[in-house]
Every structure is written in structure tokens, then in C-alpha cells.
From Swiss-Prot:
GO biological process, one term: isoleucyl-tRNA aminoacylation
Gene expressing this chain: ileS
Species annotation: Shewanella baltica (strain OS185)
The name this protein goes by in its record: Isoleucine--tRNA ligase
Subunit structure: Monomer.
Database matches in Gene3D superfamilies: 1.10.730.20, HUPs
Amino acid sequence: MSDYKFTLNLPETEFPMRGNLANREPEMLERWTKDGLYQQIRDSRIGRTPFILHDGPPYANGSIHIGHSVNKILKDIIIKSKTMSGFDAPYVPGWDCHGLPIELKVEQKVGKPGQKISAAEFREECRKYAAEQVNGQREDFIRLGVLGDWQNPYLTMDFSTEANIVRSLSKVIESGHLHKGVKPVHWCTDCGSALAEAEVEYEDKTSPAIDVAFVAADSKAVAAKFGVSGYSHPVSMVIWTTTPWTLPANRALSLSPELDYSLVEFEKDGVTQALILAEVLVESCLTRYNVESHTVLGSAKGAAFELVRFNHPFLDFDVPAILGDHVTTDAGTGIVHTAPGHGQDDFVVGQKYGLEVANPVGDNGVYKPDTEYFAGQHVFKANDNVVALLREKSALLNHVAYRHSYPHCWRHKTPIIFRATPQWFISMDNHGLRTQALKEIEQTQWIPDWGQSRIEKMVENRPDWCISRQRTWGVPITLFVNRETEELHSDSVSLMERVASRIEQQGIQAWWDLDAAELLGDEAEQYRKVTDTLDVWFDSGSTFSSVVAARPEFHGHGVDLYLEGSDQHRGWFMSSLMISTAMNGKAPYKQVLTHGFTVDGKGRKMSKSIGNVIAPQTVTNKLGADILRLWVAATDYSGEMTVSDEILNRSADAYRRIRNTARFLLANLNGFEPAKDLVAVEDMVALDRWVVRRAAALQQEIIEAYEQYNFHIVTQKLMQFCSVELGSFYLDIIKDRQYTAKQEGHARRSCQSALYLISEAMVRWIAPILSFTADEVWQLLPGERDAYVFTQEWYQGLKSVTLATDLSDDYWQQLLTVRNEVNKVIEQARRDKRIGGSLEAEVTLFADAALTEQLTHIGDELRFVLLTSEAKVLPLADATSEAVETELASLKLLVASSTAEKCERCWHHREEVGTIEAHPTLCTRCVTNIEGDGEVRLFA
């Protein structure tokens, strides 16, 4: 054997079987950085059509989690695949750097601004803290193999970006969308600030649910509206609320104009009383009040009670009954307690009737000193006292604990309140912003498409956007307001540009350091500087202008794609849409793609308390980033993305299949020089031409899947190709030819050429997903090439050639099916100990006429396809009783152990072994391959 071993073309490669990714990937990253890989990619696409994916900035606080990884990897896959398609696709990562979470972290270290530290010093500490957080997150993102301009990211706290955010606000003002108003807004008493819609989370909370009677100022007149004359008992309207603390701010009772209301009389505790309730809710209400018998005295429409007065249950004034479309009969009494200072619907209907917007509650959630009964009490703690006072005043009909969904602060996880405060708003309707935004939504492609209806509903129903915050660390609302009239300075837009120029040089502190006289001169005494800061959603929502329109690498090209988690419909997608539409009359994006949240194997959210958190850092240190990237790509991101150790281990198994395929390809390209050894597709052995044709068709499918952002389809097709067409068929068949054919002969070079073309294509297919592995493969491929696969385009060398004499794809598919049947029978023979390996087998195929014609077409080469030493085809009618039936009605099989001698070199059992004097242990084919011109293969 040792004499002939050196005549074989044994596979050889430096590409290791084990990826050892956790150790090797950091080494590759060092090389990428040293070589300036990102800039190489940029240089390779100068002058090409731009594709702009704008990075939604993560918040610069804390370590990245698995959701961050999903987001950044998806973006990286898109950028790399678009680059492979020839686009100039820059990637500028960004960070959101202002806002409350950073303030809270800094407060823990240095205290609140204005106490131990000045506001200016506090802002500087916030800036330092955010920079530290950015550096930590940046290293983690780079470790994932995400390529981008990491040395020049955009930060919302960059002086230039802060200045451009101010400029964006000035354009919104110039377009007439800004107004100041006293409105109820989401208010966190722990933050002491208004919250944006996106900063509100809904959690279950137990609240006191109470039914409260408001006695009519003139009961006799109210009863008369029900057709009851001369009524002598008190008549009350009843409200139901879960916020007793808002009753001091009650200024009306709202009814539905077309709803039927009943006047219901009953006796309880010796007292006769009459209540007004929605007709459809009478039974449920009286059950709550433990009323066993009652009389309905009459019925009337809600419209009959407009402006009728009712006494406040514990304050010394009366309130009107008013009409509103927001009144429903889903729960309660059909009559709504209306406090314009503590509810959006209440405020809107209150404006219609000119009601006072009462706000007895301070920033900290404590009643103001002039609040009767409850001064100095925190609103949530006052609930019990309100209930007790109502009971004392005989106005309480029912009181129970009620579990319901209630808004909470996203940061403190504590219940929030609605509270009327003076704030700055972007109006949804004054200048048609809502209408135009809805039109722009229709012009945008939403992926998945349900995203469109989701954001449409949000835009249809959202209130004006409160953009002001009472915080220290944020971009200032750089406005001057007249001290007497509260009007904006008439030259606000040009003044804002002058302020922006200063911020560009000195950062946001320039506003607080600014003496108004420097800009306003003699007018300075008439105006005051606004001290509010912008909602951070304005910061990130304006980056299409403050960043994309400003940075040269974007070439002034609009944004093609926004890609974030599905929570961003009400967050970044919404704020960007509002600002862009207000500024430019159009959406800032052409496509919006959303991905689902990550959950564990049981569908639960990641939670430290549950102990099911999977940190990306742990995954990369143990399995490698390419395993994490493969999991992301292989998961359908349109729904929840399930991840667990078991799932990641399955990804590692799938990765090994791809790696082993790549290793086989590289090992069998040993000694192949494309410049001199490449066989034209037209001249290849038929099977080689078929596999190149399959690869060419697959490449089109893969490119299409990348273009549609269906990365799970890419991985499915890639795995199918590696496992079935290559692994179970082509690579299995060509091993014999590759190892035993004459080294320089056509049979081997044809095979190597096919392997080379597939390798060139496949390394590009996997590069957007398995970036580290693709780079590793690229460095070992034969032939002259650029330094990195990432500067390449999809491979053009795959030719889909079909000669007139060629066997069709259907033919090879049929042969694959036949081979699978043969393998089953051989495997059974091995289990029965009738043969060892498949080369010990002689197989007889009993086939019908049509199949016989196909099988005999390739003559003696059929045995190479079946991996047997002999393959005979006989008529189906000649099948013996020992022949095994298959899943093909046209085929029966008989396997026998070969009686011929085994060739020492190729291991085939052939009759001629022992008959060649010079090489008594070889078959004729092997002698031809080592001494002659080499065997001729036409088909396989």
C-alpha cells in the first residue's frame, strides 16, 4: 500500500476542522482593524449607488444584551449583502447620549445638580459617563463582527449633532408645528418630569375602584327631565373611577349624548334615593351597591342633561354635566368623572366647554398647599383618605380593590399620573401633521407588512407630542419667551441658528452660559430664556437630518432603511416620522423593518430574576460570534426570537456542517492553480457541469433572499445545498475521481474546477452571515485575489451551461433518488454482516424500460454514482425473489458481496486485479491513472 499511497491525490488544507472561533475571531478582528478593512470597503465602492441604512442609536447606558446583538447583526448582514450587490453602503453606528437614565447614574455618584455640584459640572459628568458607556458597548459590538465606522460614530451629544438637533427644532417651528399649552401629560413623580409615550410601560396595578354620587343642585328639575314631576328625594349622577385622588380636580360629569339613561329609585338603610345610570348598566351597578329591589322612574337621552349642575361630593361648588364621545358602557356607570387636568379625554372635552384645567398636584406628586383636605399628601397615599371623606359625606356607593393595566415609568417601574403642566408640543392637527404623516406611512414599505397598520393606528390616535422635559442633561429648547405675553420672540428661527453656532463650538452648555443680552441687546429684559430640555426622542428622531444629512459619506442621499425592534413603532420610527414630516413634508425612510424580541426556550422574556438571561458576551467567549450570527440569520425575526443554550448548540451543529463543507472544498483544491488548471464549464464532466448549474441557480435564490431580507431562507438554502446536493450526493461521488484520477488529468481538473467555482461563490454567500469563517476561507482559496472577501461582489464565474448532449437536471434528480434507494439496501446488507463497505457490494438494478434507459445512459460510470464496485441494470421483469422492493415502483434491487479482488489503490473490487504483471494488486483504471494518460470520465 505504501508504494501506491503517494500516487493518490489526498486532500490537504490548513483550514482546521474545529473552528476554535472564540480564540481565533479576536485575532481576525485585530487584522481587520490593522488593515483598515472598513475603509477598504468604502474605497471599493466609490461612485456606486448609495444604500443608506441609518442606525437607530442604542442608549449609552449599561452592557449590550442579546436584543442589541440581534439588531446589530441584522444590520451588518444587510450592509454586507448590499455591498456584495455593488452598492456603496456605509454603516455609521450611533448612540443616544442624553436623558434621564444617565442623569440617575450620575446622581448616584455626585448627587443632584444644584446641591453638591453645579448644573454645568453635572452635565460634564453626564458627558463623561456617556462616553465611557459608548466605549464599552462599542467593543462588544465590534466583537460580533459588525463592520462600521467605529472610530467615528455619531453621538447625540457630539457638539455638531447637538447643534443640528437645535436646527431641526427651528425648522419644525418655522413650519408652524410648535405650540405651548397647559395639557395633561404622562408625569413621573419620581423623575419630576413629563414622559413621552415611548417612555410609558403598562403593568398590572391594584387600585381602589369607587362609585361616587354627585347630588343634583336641583333634584326636582332633574327628575322632571325623566317625566317625573314634583320629585322630593335627592337625585344623583353616579361616576365610577379607579383614581380617587383626581376627585379634587373634578370639574364636570360627562355623558354620551345618544345613550339612554335611567332614573332608578330604591331604599337603602332607611333612606330613599334616586340614581341616574346608563340604562344598560343598571343591573350591574345595583348589584355592586347591594340593592335588592328598585323602581325605574323614567328614561332620557344623555343630551337632555347638558349643562345641568351637580354638587361636588366634598368641595363647595357645583359642576356641569357635559357631553362627550369618549363615554362608553364597557365598565362603570355610563357617566365619566371629568378632571381636565388629569386626563387627555377630559382635557379635550373640557376645552370644548371652557372648563378650568385644575391641577392641585405638584411635580413630586404631592397636593399643593392650597388643596382643601389633602394638602401635603402624596396622591397615591391620599386615595384612602379620599375614600374615607366620601364615606363621611355619604357619597360613596361602592369601594373595591380593582386589578387593571396601568401606566408606569419605564425607568423607575413606578405608577405615573396624568398631570396638567405648561409644556411645549408639536401639534398633530394645527398644520395637518397627522394627515400628512398618514399619507407618508402609505408611501413607505413596512416589513413585515403588519407594521403599517400598527403605526397607522398609533398616528391616528396619538395626542400632540409633548417635546419638553424638565431635566438637566439634554438638548435645550433654545427659545426666548416674552415675559408678559408668553409669545415666542418674532425672530426665533434666526436666533436659534445663532445659538446653534455656539453649541457647535461649545456644546449645549453654551445655552446656559449665554447672557440673553448678547443676542437680544436692549430687548433682553423683555424676554426670558426657556429652561426646558428636549425629549430624547426628539434627539434620536431628528438624526436623519442632524446626522445623515450632515455627514459626507451619506452623499446627501435619503435613508433607505430603518431597522429596529417592534417596540420602535411608537418610539424611533414614530418620532422620526413626526419630525421629518414636520420639517420636510415626507417620511425620513423608504423601508422600515422590525424584528421581534428575544425570549427563552419557554417563550419567556429575558429576566435576571428568572435566571434565563443569555448574554452575548458569554456566547462569543464560549461558542464564537459566528455561531450567534448564524442563530440570528436562521431565525425568522418577524416574530419572537427564541434563544437558549440548547438552540445555540443546534446552531453550532449547523455551523459545523457548513464548516466541514468548506474544509472539504479547500482540501480538494490542493495543488489547483485557477490561472492554468481551470476547466471551462462547457468542457467539464457532466456531473461537474450539473453541480455548477445548481450552484448558479442557488446563487440567484440566495441573492433574492438577501434582497428581501429573508436571511432564514438564505441559511435554509445553504444548509440544504451543503447537506443534500453536495454532502449526500456530489461530494460523495467525486471523492473517488478526485483521489484516484491522474493528478493533471481532465477528470480531476474538471472536478477541481467545479469545486473552485462553488468555493468562490459560497464564500461570498456566507460572508454577510458567517463573516469570520468567510474571511478564514478567503485567505486559503487558491489564485490571485484581493485581501478581503468583503470588498467583492457576488461571484460571476458560475455559468449555467447546458449542452445539447447534457443530461437534464431532472435526470440527476432521478439518479439521486435511485442512489438513496441503493444506499438503504446497502446499509441493510451491512447491518446483516453480508458486506463491509459499499465498495464490497455488487448491485443489480431491476428497472422498467424508462428507468433502464436512464440508468444505462452513463454506462459503467453508474457504479461511481452508486459508490459500488459493480452496477448491473436488468429488466424489472427479471427480478428474482431475493430482490428488494423500493419506494420506486419502477425499481427493485439486489445487493451481493463482490467475489472479485480488491484494488490496493482505489479499493474497488475488480475482476482484473491480479492480471496485470507490473501491478498485480491494481485494477486497470488505477494503472492508467498512474502510468498512462489517465482515465476518461464523461458523466461522473
